[in-house]
Amino acid sequence: MATTAASSASEPEVEPQAGPEAEGEEDEAKPAGVQRKVLSGAVAAEAAEAKGPGWDLQREGASGSDGDEEDAMASSAESSAGEDEWEYDEEEEKNQLEIERLEEQLSINGYDYNCHVELIRLLRLEGELSRVRAARQKMSELFPLTEELWLEWLHDEISMAMDGLDREHVYELFERAVKDYICPNIWLEYGQYSVGGIGQKGGLEKVRSVFERALSSVGLHMTKGLAIWEAYREFESAIVEAARLEKVHSLFRRQLAIPLYEMEATFAEYEEWSEEPMPESVLQSYQKALGQLEKYKPYEEALLQAEAPRLAEYQAYIDFEMKIGDPARIQLIFERALVENCLVPDLWIRYSQYLDRQLKVKDLVLSVHSRAVRNCPWTVALWSRYLLAMERHGLDHQTISATFENALSAGFIQATDYVEIWQVYLDYLRRRVDFRQDSSKELEELRSMFTRALEYLQQEVEERFSESGDPSCLIMQSWARVEARLCNNMQKARELWDSIMTRGNAKYANMWLEYYNLERAHGDTQHCRKALHRAVQCTSDYPEHVCEVLLTMERTEGTLEDWDLAIQKTETRLARVNEQRMKAAEKEAALVQQEEEKAEQRKKVRAEKKALKKKKKTRGADKRREDEDEENEWGEEEEEQPSKRRRTENSLASGEASAMKEETELSGKCLTIDVGPPSKQKEKAASLKRDMPKVAHDSSKDSVTVFVSNLPYSIEEPEVKLRPLFEVCGEVVQIRPIFSNRGDFRGYCYVEFGEEKSAQQALELDRKIVEGRPMFVSPCVDKSKNPDFKVFRYSTTLEKHKLFISGLPFSCTKEELEDICKAHGTVKDLRLVTNRAGKPKGLAYVEYENESQASQAVMKMDGMTIRENVIKVAISNPPQRKVPEKPEVRTAPGAPMLPRQMYGARGKGRTQLSLLPRALQRQGAAPQAENGPAPGPAVAPSVATEAPKMSNADFAKLLLRK
């Protein structure tokens, strides 16, 4: 970098040529097949030269057979070259087809960012210089380009620049590049390229102008600004003139007064270069900059340690700079943050708000607003602020109108966004009108725009979102106020309010009162009375309030006849309203009673099932006890030799069985032994459970253990089935499946790993399909100690880059839906929502790469028909779950207060009944002791301990009586 600047500055009359770097890029721009051909030709030439002059003599003295071999070798080389050419032609044809596909897709959706990038890459690979230039130009008009895209474009143009006109074209590209984002590397390239044109007219002034602008833009950059300072300083040092030495001194002093990394090295270099002693002012500025550097270092180190996009670190850095209040540094840190967070609308809003309120520099403010809407075109707040800023700084009407039209085509994600942008533009048009004139061009334009706004919301917006976004008719209300207050045209205002009421707003009291207040201020008493009478008849939400307003007006302005009529109408209306409310209350009470009856029925059914289950369980336990008693009586010898017993159970011969039968008959007791094998599945499960030792749960290993649930109950050997799945995450120490008393697998288990990172990696297997069911994998947490612990992988807030799709056919697969969604952008993730059994629910979540692709997909896919199912597509914004209020814990009189842990993880149940008779709950009054010790807790009577035990049926009867 420094060498290039120095050499170029010392030889101003020589035009710098593209070096090896540019040549290498030209090679990269060539098709891969051409490069292979050139490489093959070079290798052949080197081989011919390596043969030496004796090669021709050997050819002359060679035999006929040698000539045949040479012909064979030549034909082989020709065939190899032909194969390479065929491979290149095939690859070129494939690239051309892909280029055509991308161009067709961009003709449908020009805002597909990834398609633009891929098209430029393929055109550059094919060497289509004119087409790649046009593709880059089109993309730069729609999107701000990243530093990498600009540098690639600039390097290509620099390598092709041949004369002064081409150099001016490259200068224009540099000027466009530095406006998109703050890029120190682009400024450095700009400065170095301008050094190459120093021999032209005004070349020296051009170089200095570029470097000075670079210092103003990125010279304060603590980590990357040093390169700009060094390049500028070395350029000035290369010009050996006495007058230029002071320029180098000035650059050193300016650099040392700014907190930058490696300041000590720059100071040492200045001391070595300068022949004069260091001035005191320079030392003071240097020490002050060092002190500032120490304050900034924690924030810079936080940025270096964090990973992109580092939004939180940048926000903290911005807050710190805002407290200090240096405008240049505040602007720099905002620009640095936006390089990595260009798709964060809130960051653009905060930056533009600071410029609007603090700096108020026209060019800077409008430039930032323009970049903001190019980066986040779907954010209506940025467009609104842009229009206000343009009006604030006095831009012409045509420019503001064109910007508004661009906003309408930006593709907002909500219908209300269009209402907001229309309101901002209509407010601007209203401020242009001189209402002292009866008629003007501006007033006619305002009225025509009000009409167009209503048509646009009714047609364009309602067709796209199934709603106009303006249910309260705010735009029509604004129009009515303009006509009534500023144009004295109450007739038009009344027509507008009639239209507002016919759009479903006549039942709201606030709408009638708004109209009444307008008539009160700019109309007459007759129309006020008429409006209130209509309001009394139509209002359904707050009729009492409207009736009160009518009576108040008649009390102050009406006659006796008006008062009587108002009383009659209000009483009739309120009586009807009360009757309707009573009917609604009765209907609601009937529904509540019906729900209670259903709940009681469900309780009764559950109680019966529970009693039946307990009865079966009791019978099973009695049967097992009988079997155990029988085994104890006849199996004493087998208990002494358990290994022998297991062998005889599986390999008992018929002769041994008959001998045992004879032995039992002689002893006078009959014992029937069933030697037939039981069900294989139950035998295997029972033996697996019997052979597996019981392991107590060790809570100290929760960090290396995961809990796996929702597994199919039909798995015969869970450990064998699950071990290969989890071994990809790391060493599996143990898998502990849980079985029932009968040896059946209960569908969940614990998996213990050797390392904690393996357990964390295993959580990524959550929702993996195992034999048709989604397997749930969650951390191993003791719910008794953490009752509120819940694991939910997905966000429950608004995600503008993710779509929620409903109404899908159950037969729709993930691959089919992904193919549909890919047509509108890059799909990062797609998830079909299923139930616990793995069956689809007709819902899906689709995550796109950015918000613009998601908004385009909503507009294109909403209302689409898939297999006769009309799907609905919206931005993912799950509704907030209501947190149930914790009921007040009531205890029986005299009952001891129990801690929450005694009730379990969920606390007390909803129904808390004290099943202790009231007679036993009453306790004698504690003796009052004024100066004695506090009485001890009352001891419960011993009668309570002798109360008969109640069965489940008794409890159910008590609940049903309630």
From Swiss-Prot:
Species in which this protein is naturally found: Mus musculus (Mouse)
Tissue: Ubiquitously expressed, with low level of expression in liver, heart and skeletal. Also detected in hematopoietic cells (at protein level).
One Pfam family from the record: HAT_PRP39_N
Cellular component aspect of the GO annotation: Cajal body; cytoplasm; nuclear speck; nucleoplasm; nucleus; U4/U6 snRNP; U6atac snRNP
Functional description taken from the UniProt entry: U6 snRNP-binding protein that functions as a recycling factor of the splicing machinery. Promotes the initial reassembly of U4 and U6 snRNPs following their ejection from the spliceosome during its maturation. Also binds U6atac snRNPs and may function as a recycling factor for U4atac/U6atac spliceosomal snRNP, an initial step in the assembly of U12-type spliceosomal complex. The U12-type spliceosomal complex plays a role in the splicing of introns with non-canonical splice sites. May also function as a substrate-targeting factor for deubiquitinases like USP4 and USP15.
Nuclear localization signal, short sequence motif: residues: 602-609
Domain RRM: 704-782, 801-878
Protein name: Spliceosome associated factor 3, U4/U6 recycling protein
Oligomer status and interactors: Component of the 7SK snRNP complex at least composed of P-TEFb (composed of CDK9 and CCNT1/cyclin-T1), HEXIM1, HEXIM2, BCDIN3, SART3 proteins and 7SK and U6 snRNAs. Interacts with AGO1 and AGO2. Interacts with PRPF3 and USP4; the interaction with PRPF3 is direct and recruits USP4 to its substrate PRPF3. Interacts with USP15; the interaction is direct.
Xref: InterPro entries: HAT (IPR003107), LSM_interact (IPR008669), Nucleotide-bd_a/b_plait_sf (IPR012677), RBD_domain_sf (IPR035979), RRM_dom (IPR000504), SART3_RRM1 (IPR034217), SART3_RRM2 (IPR034218), TPR-like_helical_dom_sf (IPR011990)
Gene designation per UniProt: Sart3
Intervals holding HAT repeats: 127-159, 165-196, 202-238, 243-276, 325-357, 360-392, 395-431, 441-474, 488-521
Biased composition (Acidic residues): 81-92, 627-640
Signal peptide (UniProt feature, chain positions): none
Induction line: Up-regulated in proliferating hematopoietic cells.
Biased composition (Basic residues): 603-618
Modification sites for Phosphoserine: 10, 216, 651, 795, 852
Any one Gene Ontology molecular-function term assigned to this protein's record: protein-macromolecule adaptor activity
Coiled-coil features, chain-numbered ranges: 559-618
Basic and acidic residues bias spans: 591-602, 680-696
Region (Required for interaction with USP4): 488-521
UniProt modified residues of type Omega-N-methylarginine: 906
